[in-house]
Amino acid sequence: MRSIWTGSIGFGLVSIPVKLFSAVQETRLDLDMLDSRDHAHIKFQRINENTRKEVPYDKIVKGYKYDDDYVIIEDADFEAAAPEKSKVIEIESFVDLVSVNPMYYESSYYTQPATKKNKAYALLLEALKKSGKAGLARFVLRSTESLCIVHPVEQSIVVTRIRFAQQIRDQSELELDAKITVSKKELDMGLALINQYAEPLELSKYKDEYHTQLMTIIEQKAKGKRPTIKKLKPKKAKGDDLYDQLMSSLKVKKGA
């Protein structure tokens, strides 16, 4: 893996030099855009809207529109805005890991100590495991400030970017009916169904089936075969009574 950021994790007066590596990888198929008439590749060009000529990449700069003009922002300006956050993941507090709502999660990154046999790294990793806590921190990655949690995963300290509170939309925008009454009998049956389906989390057994099926179709078409299209068979509910549906679901699970 290639590191995408080099800096340090700071907590208290302790500074741990680390490298950051992306912990996730895309499984999407790499599809090219083609002209349907001759299957030639589609190319996008960076065109100057005044001269209508293509602009070399090294001549492109970033600008912010301010009072009908543009202020040009250079790499040094991004770093000057928060020099310490560009190089340090400063832990501001420790929180219960389970208290972080999954809605806030974004991307995760592995950290690796920049030096071998780094005792401070080993200490923080072990302390996070023992305490069940996660460090809450802020840092700048790719010119964007991110809130993040610093938490242990097996033998690595992981930095997971999380959203700021203002990025989460308020549920008041939804048309939700809070006046629906659920009977105790229905609730008990719902809880029984949840317990029936409850099992230890094993994400490794879940595969990207859509990706696999799409790849099968591509391989069939490459061989000149017509792919077999599976028709969706909608599940029919047995009646409109919620209790009966829950009871039937329990029976189906037991007989599986």
Q: PLM features: what roles do these ranges have?
A:
Residues 1-256:
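Boundary segments of small protein-protein interaction reader/adaptor domains
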